[in-house]
């Protein structure tokens, strides 16, 4: 305990420096919207999002220190606090809310209103922050030195290395601009195809790769291990399952297909089989993966909840000094009560008082679990999808048992699941950000206000983003697979209507169990089973680039800086492609995409088009090397 009391942050508690300023709010809100939109687009495409804390911190340091000539590390910390909330809220929203759009596309309900999406996102985000605030002293202060908080600590280190902020910010902006340009060339002007495919005559499987910079960046950031698991899942689906389905079921019409499998393959190729059958196998694998990860985490979850509640009963350390000031507890309790009443009474959230009670109970439980688990194992290993699956199963069973079935009950279940998923994601992000602030000497109260500002900004933007993407391409398509949302939809329909192709679902479940038995992390493997193999292959390329960096013969310090530069550049590429992806969605809604499409005018033959795609992909890879591997090589001369 003495060691904890003697901890000295970078900025002393008695020193007051700018934090929550007009500059930090404006920059933070902009980054919250940008990274929220970019991660919404990315998550719907590849089934995962990437943390915005470090790129937001680097951008803020670059702008505040280099452009504005100010030296305020706590101001930069507030920027990343506000900005990272956008990514976390987007992650929680896209894993669940697209299910409402999918039901609307099937004619089961009207499309959800912008107000409905906004209300759910805002309530979930605000509850996530408010539930976490009382836990700060227990998790951040009392367990300092016990909980490592990987991302929170790394973000603090980036901010402390502020003198490098300008150069690092330029790396992020370079990735943003370059990826945006390539995205516009590939999907806007359509000068080259977005995929390179290889097919073998007489064999129903196919392999290939997409050439998108953001997808490749996901592989680099996740690393070779996770990338290889996803690629393995894609190989199982596209080179084993699809050929087997076509070979043994060619003359059969199997539900949910409506034509003989042979005819489906002849007219639509492997993609038709993927759309009718593989998605259900992938969803079964994802469900099993989420449940397995939750079961494996149960001892830790129980211990986490128990320890957090015990710690909350302890004496608050630090008195009323600046670095230990939280939002007033009375205000927090009143706000939680008001939000609970809104969940019950607002027509945009179709749940009863029972549903509101479920939200509060599960919300506080999973907020507590998420807040501590990110401290133990990091945000990347926080089983948010497993928490959402557990909540959905229990909520759907309760709603059906109490007579709230049909589409109304399904809407209520997804609303509850969405709020809980967002609560868990935001609580984890808040916990990481408060750890960063604790190390730097930030004022917790100002950070908590910053989190609320970020939640409001991203919550107001996410509904528009979802509407745009649905109008442009639709969810559950090859363009936007939305694997988690498809899974949540499947779970609710399975409980309410019992009309799923259970044989396909259980094939996926047993694939996931087999992966777990041989020691393969189930969730990345399951996402790989669900997603197109071309997307998985592109992710694998990014993972191989990272592997090459890790295996290089450079000195340890140079290797770490090189890998870090690559991470920043790839973070920028994800943001850049996401921004242009949203812009192209706007173009598609207003039919501008047809005007700028040059593919028909060029009329390239398939071999020439493939060569063009290979050249573009090679350029994307070379530019990653330029801003990481070769950048440090030049500096060392």
Where would I find each of the regions flagged by the language model?
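Alpha-helical multipass membrane-protein architecture
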Residues: 1-637
């Amino acid at each position: 305990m003495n060691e904890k009391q003697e901890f000295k942050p970078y900025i002393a508690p008695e020193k007051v420096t700018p934090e929550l300023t007009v500059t930090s709010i404006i920059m933070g809100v902009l980054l919250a919207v940008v990274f929220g939109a970019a991660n919404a687009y990315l998550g719907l495409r590849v089934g995962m999002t990437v943390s915005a804390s470090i790129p937001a911190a680097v951008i803020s340091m670059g702008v505040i220190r280099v452009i504005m000539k100010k030296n305020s590390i706590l101001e930069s910390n507030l920027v990343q606090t506000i900005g990272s909330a956008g990514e976390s809220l987007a992650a929680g929203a896209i894993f669940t809310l697209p299910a409402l759009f999918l039901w609307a596309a099937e004619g089961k309900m009207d499309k959800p209103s912008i107000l409905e999406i906004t209300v759910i996102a805002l309530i979930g985000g605000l509850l996530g922050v408010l539930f976490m605030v009382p836990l700060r002293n227990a998790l951040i202060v009392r367990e300092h030195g016990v909980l490592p908080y990987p991302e929170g600590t790394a973000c603090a280190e980036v901010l402390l290395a502020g003198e490098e902020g300008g150069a690092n910010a330029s790396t992020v902006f370079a990735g943003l601009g370059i990826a945006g340009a390539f995205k516009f060339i590939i999907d806007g002007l359509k000068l080259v195809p977005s995929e390179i495919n290889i097919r073998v005559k007489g064999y129903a499987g196919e392999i290939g790769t997409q050439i998108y910079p953001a997808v490749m960046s996901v592989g680099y950031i996740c690393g070779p291990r996770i990338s290889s698991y996803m690629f393995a899942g894609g190989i199982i689906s596209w080179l084993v399952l699809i050929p087997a389905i076509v070979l043994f079921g060619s003359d059969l019409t199997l539900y949910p297909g409506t034509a003989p499998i042979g005819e489906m393959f002849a007219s639509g190729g492997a993609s038709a089989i993927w759309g009718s059958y593989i998605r259900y196998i992938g969803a079964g694998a994802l469900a099993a993966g989420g449940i397995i990860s939750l079961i494996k985490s149960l001892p830790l979850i129980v211990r986490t909840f128990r320890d957090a509640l015990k710690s909350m009963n302890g004496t608050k350390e630090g008195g009323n000094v600046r670095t230990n000031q939280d939002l007033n507890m009375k205000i927090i309790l009143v706000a939680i009560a008001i939000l609970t009443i809104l969940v019950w009474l607002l027509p945009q959230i179709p749940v009863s008082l029972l549903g509101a009670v479920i939200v509060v109970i599960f919300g506080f439980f999973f907020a507590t679990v998420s807040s501590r688990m990110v401290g133990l194992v990091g945000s990347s290993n926080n089983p948010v999808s497993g928490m959402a699956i557990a909540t959905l199963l229990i909520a759907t069973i309760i709603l059906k048992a109490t007579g709230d079935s049909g589409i109304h009950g399904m809407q209520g279940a997804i609303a509850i699941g969405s709020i809980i998923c967002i609560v868990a994601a935001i609580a984890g992000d808040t916990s990481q950000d408060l750890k960063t602030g604790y190390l730097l000497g930030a004022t917790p109260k100002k950070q908590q206000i910053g989190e609320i500002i970020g939640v409001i900004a991203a919550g107001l933007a996410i509904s528009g983003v979802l509407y745009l993407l649905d109008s442009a391409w639709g969810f559950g398509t090859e363009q936007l697979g939305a694997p988690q949302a498809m899974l949540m939809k499947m779970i609710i329909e399975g409980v309410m209507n019992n009309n799923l192709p259970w044989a396909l679902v259980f094939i996926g479940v047993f694939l996931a169990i087999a992966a777990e038995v041989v020691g393969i992390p189930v969730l990345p493997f399951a996402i790989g089973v669900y997603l197109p193999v071309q997307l998985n292959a592109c992710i694998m390329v990014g993972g191989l680039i990272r592997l090459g960096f890790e295996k290089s013969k450079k000195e340890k310090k140079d290797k770490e800086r090189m890998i870090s530069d690559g991470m920043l550049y790839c973070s920028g590429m994800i943001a850049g492609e996401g921004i242009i992806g949203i812009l192209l969605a706007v173009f598609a809604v207003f039919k501008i995409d047809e005007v700028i499409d040059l593919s028909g005018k060029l009329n390239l033959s398939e071999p020439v088009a493939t060569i063009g795609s290979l050249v573009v992909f090679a350029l994307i890879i070379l530019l990653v090397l330029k801003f990481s591997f070769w950048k440090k090589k030049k500096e060392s001369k």
